Amino acid sequence: MNTYKTYSERGQQHPNACARSLFELMERNESNLSVAVDVTTKKELLSIADAVGPFVCVLKTHIDIVEDFDHDLVAQLEQLAKKHDFLIFEDRKFADIGNTVKHQYANGIYKIASWSHITNAHTVPGEGIIKGLGEVGLPLGRGLLLLAEMSSKGALTKGSYTSESVEMARRNKDFVFGFIAQHKMNEHDDEDFVVMSPGVGLDVKGDGLGQQYRTPHEVIVESGGDIIIVGRGIYGNPDQVEAQAKRYRQAGWDAYLERVRLHKK
């Protein structure tokens, strides 16, 4: 199964351009860490991005919560992505009909498609959402993740919702390269979906607001996830940002090496 191959092997054979770039970058930087930078000022976002940049493969943003957003922020984020060799993932969670999301992705004040390598979408509206986003993203070499499962307590993303989301991804492998999910989604030898898993923590099990945390070992070795998404565990203490990024990067990479070892033929 492709889940258990090395990132390098998976990158060489992946049908999606964005996924190929991502796997190559992960192997090159020895990182499967994504930091979710959920802060509300341009200064904080750029400061954290620069501090964690050397240790991540993906920087995850919520650009619409930044109160002083401007296009200089985007330009500086793009510069940091080049400087530190990471991809940008705007966690937009599109959830409307195809024609609407097409404009939300390409236009408006954020113009997400112009700078974000990866974005994501709910599958609630049906397959049209993938087609609409793909019209914009495919020509730009972008990649889409579908929300198959969420890490919050009581989430409705389970059962038939999850299985239908996987079927939609299978029909759109040119643009959809993976999922936001809690475990591996690959069932067939001819598919290789990248799984990014939120809700990762080394020190706590929850946040009192419904978030449930798992360790990198649980996510990658036990559940078959590929990339760990960490937020407050890294930048919650401003004096510890770099140290925590190093710590999570090492924990994630060690878990990946263990998984490869366990499944070597």
Curated annotation (Swiss-Prot):
Name the reaction it catalyses.
orotidine 5'-phosphate + H(+) = UMP + CO2
Pathway(s) served? Pyrimidine metabolism; UMP biosynthesis via de novo pathway; UMP from orotate: step 2/2
Pfam families named among the record's database cross-references: OMPdecase
Q: Which GO terms describe its biological process?
A: 'de novo' pyrimidine nucleobase biosynthetic process; 'de novo' UMP biosynthetic process
Binding positions (substrate): 38, 60-62, 91-100, 213, 232
The Enzyme Commission number assigned here is 4.1.1.23
Task: Kindly list the GO molecular function terms attached to this UniProt entry.
Answer: orotate phosphoribosyltransferase activity; orotidine-5'-phosphate decarboxylase activity
Q: Where is the active site?
A: K93 (proton donor)
Q: Where is the signal peptide?
A: none
PROSITE patterns in alphabetical order: OMPDECASE
Q: Which CDD domains match?
A: OMP_decarboxylase_like (cd04725)
- Which InterPro entries did the record assign? Aldolase_TIM, OMPdecase, OMPdecase_AS, OMPdeCOase_dom, RibuloseP-bd_barrel
Going by the UniProt record, its keywords in alphabetical order are: Decarboxylase, Lyase, Pyrimidine biosynthesis
PANTHER family assigned: OROTATE PHOSPHORIBOSYLTRANSFERASE, URIDINE 5'-MONOPHOSPHATE SYNTHASE
As for family, the record states: Belongs to the OMP decarboxylase family.
- Provide the protein name: Orotidine 5'-phosphate decarboxylase
Please report the organism this UniProt entry assigns to the protein.
Answer: Mucor circinelloides f. lusitanicus (Mucor racemosus var. lusitanicus)
**What gene is behind this protein?**
pyrG
